[in-house]
Design a protein with these regions (language model features):
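Alpha-helical elements of Rossmann-like donor-binding domains used by nucleotide-donor carbohydrate transfer enzymes
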Residues: 66-69, 96, 185, 226, ...
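Short Gly/Pro-enriched turn/cap motifs at secondary-structure boundaries
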Residues: 14, 31-32, 116, 136-138
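Conserved beta-strand hairpin/beta-sheet module of binuclear metal-dependent hydrolase folds
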Residues: 8-72, 146-158, 163
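Active-site HxH/HxHxD metal-binding segment of metal-dependent hydrolases
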Residues: 35-36, 56-133, 153
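C-terminal regulatory/interaction regions
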Residues: 229-274
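Metallo-beta-lactamase
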Residues: 48-53, 58-61, 131-230
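Glycine/proline-rich low-complexity segments that form flexible loops, beta-turns, and polyproline
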Residues: 1-7, 21, 112-115, 140
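Histidine-centered divalent metal-coordination motifs
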Residues: 84-90, 140, 202, 264
Length: 274
């Protein structure tokens, strides 16, 4: 995480129409961790009556009903709910949303699923004529997924890439090695599969997907080097490392920063660097 906004050509506003096939409904749960709030995504083919919802968000009846009414105003019936990962700000409302819409919930983690189908690497969701490709992006959490929407040259990244700042590697569930691999996987989508736009789980849409992902990779390398140097200088506890390395970050975010530091320390140990 960082207090400096990354490149990526972020839009000025959060919420509303993002691409030809996506509309964002912003949940009313702003905080230092969730930024403006959770982005709930309604995804559909323009000429289809069916829509997919990605990350219904927190258990907030008003928000869940707003998602349903927004879909209806677009002439869409919600047919499926997908989860990028299981954190409560993305998934807590999924059960109630399933009751409101009568839809199954698909996720990588079996504990989050409602219905007969989950999600697996290589799956393609085709509801209402859509093509949503499941992309494994563990690291923020072990169950983190992204969804590649080729028709809009976009990728919905959950918390793997945010629209502002950087994300936490939520140790011990999240692992830095996995996260770096996930960023490289997203980078490959921007280099070889035409992805230009990031539709994040929090914050504004990023119109320069490659620039955003490459910033994340560079930022992670920089933070890792800082942590390694801090250890070499004799700082021995995660809290000491946080105070030294994350001095530029709002102290309200230090508990999350400590999770990332623990993940970085594990990574350095695993690779024999400390």
């Amino acid at each position: 995480m960082t207090s400096v906004p990354q490149p990526g050509n972020p839009r000025a506003e959060v919420g509303g129409r993002a691409t030809a096939r996506t509309v964002c409904v912003l949940a009313p749960n702003p905080s230092p961790m969730t930024l403006d709030g959770t982005n709930t995504w309604i995804v559909s083919e323009p000429d289809s009556e069916f829509a997919v919802v990605i990350d219904p968000g927190p258990l907030d009846e008003g928000h869940l009903n707003t998602v349903v009414s927004t879909a209806h105003s677009l002439g869409k019936r919600i047919a499926l709910t997908l989860l990028t990962h299981g954190h409560p700000d993305h998934a807590e409302g999924a059960g109630r949303f399933a009751e409101l819409t009568g839809t199954p919930v698909r996720a990588l983690d079996p504990a989050l699923r409602l219905g007969d189908e989950g999600l697996a690497v290589g799956d393609v969701v085709t509801t209402g004529g859509l093509e949503l490709r499941v992309v494994p992006t563990p690291g923020h959490t072990a169950d983190s997924l992204s969804f590649h929407l080729p028709a809009d040259r976009a990728v919905l990244t959950g918390d793997t890439v945010l629209g502002r700042g950087t994300t936490v590697v939520a140790h011990p569930d999240g692992r830095l090695g996995d996260y770096l691999d996930s960023l490289r996987r997203l980078q490959a989508l921007t280099m070889h599969d035409g992805v230009t736009t990031v539709l994040p789980g929090h914050g504004p849409v990023l119109a320069d997907a490659r620039g955003a992902v490459e910033f994340y990779l560079a930022h992670r390398a920089h933070r890792l080097a800082q942590v390694e140097t801090a250890v070499e200088q004799g700082l021995t506890t995660p809290s000491e490392v946080v105070a030294h390395v994350y001095a530029d970050v709002d102290r309200a975010l230090w508990p999350a920063a400590e999770l990332s530091v623990r993940a970085q320390l594990d990574y350095l140990l695993e690779h024999g660097l400390i």
